[in-house]
Amino acid sequence: MQRQRANDTVTTFRYNTRSSSRHGISNTLRVVESKTSASSPRVRRWRKKVSDDRRSTNSDLLPMDLIKEILKRLPAKTLARFLCVSKLWSSIIRSRDLMKLFLTESSARPGRLFFTFRRKDDCFLFSSEESSVATYLFTIPASGYTNNCSFVHGLICYGTTAYASQLVVYNSSTRRSITLPEIEARSFVLKHLLGYDPIDGVYKVLCMTVPRLVLQKKKKLRNNVTDAGELILAPISLPDPPYYVIYYDPQRQSTRKVVIRGITEHNCKLLRCKKRHPCILYYVFSSQVESLMFM
């Protein structure tokens, strides 16, 4: 056995084991803890190695501008998964600079159409790219005053109560939603508009209370405006397949008809449209811009 060094410390503790007592083994364990000076050559070499490793790691990192340039090109669903990578990634994705870059980048992508059909006490939301099969998103309960729904950058704001005092904002890209604080509006129907403030880079909801409106006669077409300024015209009633949407460009004075497949063929059982409770188109939206809200 080697001789114990002078700068070592001997620590003893006892333990109980049946096997050691049977064979006459002492119940004392000697542990040698080496005390190494902080100024010893071995410690100095270890510290130098760690410092060199940190320098090499920092030099291997990509510039922040290049990281944001890569992230802005990814889909919103992919960025939502990247939030769990680290706190650094989460702060980068949630930063205001990346959100503005992402909005600008997504505006160049192909647009999507959103349809909200109502049957009796339910509203059904569908989304579809131009000339593609519609995809069912979710169902929300409809009240007697479900006549207001606002939309911007893929975010849909709608009310869940009779007077729309409880508002929900739904992100169609990440399929996540948040419920806004309830607003007291008992004797008036609440009107709300969802908008985007490009200066501060935030989304805002404008709420107004107006007297109850008398329900007007059902119109034949629903309309809205795309990000490019085209007017959207969609039939209010669910016709025989295929379902179609008309685009009108006021600058070029041109009209184009787009067929949307899948709303009646694949979702007729879901809507359960009958003559007594026909399906009615309540809203139609168009969006080319995605949002990173609720990330």
Curated annotation (Swiss-Prot):
Domain F-box intervals: 56-102
Pfam families: F-box
Superkingdom of origin: Eukaryota
PROSITE patterns assigned to the protein according to its UniProt record, in alphabetical order: FBOX
Protein name: Putative F-box protein At5g44220
Source organism: Arabidopsis thaliana
